Amino acid sequence: GDPGIGKSTLLLQVCRILADKKKVLYISGEESQTQIKLRANRMGNFADGLFLLCETNLEIIRGILEKERPELVVIDSIQTMYSEEVSSAPGSVSQVRESTNVFMQLAKGLCIPIFLSDM
């Protein structure tokens, strides 16, 4: 969807609801934890099962997912993610392709749903 139409807010609202019963990890490559918490708090209480991570490095994210084993992951947004193994800039076709492939492998390997948002 177009920038600014509320994709991030909608995803965060879904995460808040699901985090009442599940361990949910919301990964942002665009906003700080403070910004995300402020937005989440405007929607209501911040759920205990909702965890925030502000990171864009795929290798770091992979390690966290393998260690923490969340039950649901949201990536906001896929264009900000990058792999050190790909020489192009974040947001490039090759980086988005690599990021998508890594998250697909993680979803299958860890048996968890991973939602990918674009800018």
Residue ranges of model-derived segments:
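Conserved inter-motif catalytic segment of the P-loop NTP-binding fold
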Residues: D2-I5, T9-K108
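A short helix->loop->beta-strand "cap" motif at the edges of active sites that frequently abuts
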Residues: L110-I112
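Conserved H-loop
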Residues: M119
